[in-house]
Amino acid sequence: MANNLILLGLPGAGKGTQAEFIVKDYPTVHISTGDIFRANLANDTSLGKQAREYMDAGNLVPDEITNAMVADRLNQDDVQANGFMLDGYPRNEAQAEFLDHYLAENNSAVSATLYFEVSDSLLRERLLGRGRADDTPEVIDNRLEVNKAANLPLVDYYKRAGVLHTIDGGRELAEVYHDVKAVLDNL
């Protein structure tokens, strides 16, 4: 069975960087929720049209629409053959439960959840170092707090499920990836 991975961590924890390393060494499909949304919006799909209505009104897209977009992507041949690595989904426990049920219906499951743990001070330093105009200390602190509120229940959820692997993301890239490989090589 192909491995199905979830990457969790606060902004600046290194999820995207580690995902780039993982896809070079392991046959898995990196799926970013942002990419799924952009594809549905660009292709003007039924789900994309529904999502656009919420987004244009300045509202969050409901879980049902996000879940349906993710399910459509997970149903594609490349994912069926190689498994997936989700980045940016699930964002809450209801989405995690949907994903578990969806996978179970398709005789599959989450193989591992990699949680990249990094201190707040290092996250701030990394995010400020990106040089984005909107990355002020106040905006960054708010983003970290909002993301903590979403991430921590998911960390607990996957810990209870027995698939959580906490990785110290505050070290050199090669050291972090060494720990990632140790997890993936034992799946």
UniProtKB/Swiss-Prot annotation:
Pathway(s) of this molecule: Purine metabolism; AMP biosynthesis via salvage pathway; AMP from ADP: step 1/1
Protein's recorded name: Adenylate kinase
Alphabetical keyword list: ATP-binding, Cytoplasm, Kinase, Nucleotide biosynthesis, Nucleotide-binding, Transferase
Top-level taxonomy: Bacteria, Bacillati, Bacillota, Bacilli, Lactobacillales
One of the Pfam families matching this protein, by short name: ADK
TM helices/strands, residue ranges: none
Example of a GO MF term: adenylate kinase activity
Keyword Oxidoreductase belongs to the record: no
Span list, region LID: 129-135
Subcellular location(s) per record: Cytoplasm
Catalytic activity, EC: 2.7.4.3
Written domain comment of the UniProt record: Consists of three domains, a large central CORE domain and two small peripheral domains, NMPbind and LID, which undergo movements during catalysis. The LID domain closes over the site of phosphoryl transfer upon ATP binding. Assembling and dissambling the active center during each catalytic cycle provides an effective means to prevent ATP hydrolysis.
Positions that bind ATP: 12-17, 130, 171
